[in-house]
Amino acid sequence: MRLTGWIGLGLLITTLGLSACATSEPPPPNLYKRLGGREGISIVVGDFVTNMAADTRVNARFKDMKGPEIEKLKSNLADQICDATGGPCSYLGRDMKTVHKGMKITEAEWNATVENLVKALDKNNVGAQTKSELLGALAPMKADIVGQ
């Protein structure tokens, strides 16, 4: 009888342990999902490009771009952000160093670009932690863009 009692107690403890595991919280959504997936990222990118076009500190860089070129830029930017945030996209465009070679982008222009992205994120109510994580994910590109 005692052996049966110990076996029963062992089964009860095992069952409770397994049920605790089964009810554990799912992992938090990744950065891509917190940004609203591809749709949310595309909206932010659209607002970002609008901000850049209106910003006299940087808009001369885009003055010769026409509709299809702007749409390609938006698509490439959305792919980059999607890729950098753990989404299912792959950025297939040229690397940043090649794209920006000879442009001599300044630190001030980089800062204006970051400000315009933050403004787009704020407009779309992206939280502080998510915003900070996104900027951190994109920050390594700076070395391949500024001063090239």
Regions inferred by a protein language model and the residue ranges of each:
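Compact alpha-helical subdomains of small soluble proteins
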Residues: T56, P68-Q129, A137-K142
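Bacterial signal peptide processing site
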Residues: A22-S24
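Post-signal-peptide N-terminal segment of Sec-exported extracytoplasmic proteins
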Residues: P28-L31, L35-S75
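Short, solvent-exposed mixed-charge patches
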Residues: G147-Q148
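C-terminal motif of bacterial Sec signal peptides marking the signal peptidase cleavage site
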Residues: G17-A20
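Bacterial N-terminal signal peptides that target proteins for export
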Residues: M1-G10
